[in-house]
């Protein structure tokens, strides 16, 4: 196994673990069902191999879902991004309330979030430094196995280079 293959294996494991955590923690207490399965958030997960390691890309609002958001009368992030994310969600899920326009439905949802907050669904743990082993606790066990594979791959490449 070469280094790139070992990194690809790690990237796949990270994506699989995040998806497993979404399945485990994705239940919305207000809706009573897992609203994260097959969601835009889940499909936004992209783990790629870079020269320096792996990179995780995920929808910008993941933090508000994972950490929740306390009722403060303020909105998470910028207002434009907040409205866009809610509008996209309403559109994707084809949410209708009587004869209300989509913009009116979006306003009702935003007002509800302002007043009631968002219950946390900790499919990932927030870490300021972006340390994946802190963000995804199950990853630690996998890292040990993966590191052995990576070390062996590096040693093989070193042997090829010097021999």
Residue map of PLM features:
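Charged, low-complexity interaction tracts
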Residues: 35-163
């Amino acid at each position: 196994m070469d280094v790139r293959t070992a990194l690809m294996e790690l990237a796949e494991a990270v994506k699989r673990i995040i998806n497993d955590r979404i399945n485990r923690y994705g239940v919305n207490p207000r809706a009573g069902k897992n609203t994260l399965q097959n969601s835009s958030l889940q499909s936004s997960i992209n783990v790629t191999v870079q020269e320096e390691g792996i990179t995780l890309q995920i929808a910008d609002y993941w933090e508000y879902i994972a950490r929740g958001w306390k009722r403060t009368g303020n909105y998470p992030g910028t207002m434009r991004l907040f409205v866009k994310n809610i509008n996209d969600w309403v559109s994707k899920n084809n949410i209708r309330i009587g004869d209300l326009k989509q913009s009116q439905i979006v306003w009702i949802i935003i007002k509800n979030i302002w007043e009631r907050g968002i219950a946390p669904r900790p499919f990932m743990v927030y870490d300021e430094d972006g340390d994946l082993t802190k963000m995804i606790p199950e990853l630690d066990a996998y890292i040990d196995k993966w590191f052995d594979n990576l070390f062996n791959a590096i040693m093989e490449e070193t042997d090829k280079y010097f021999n």
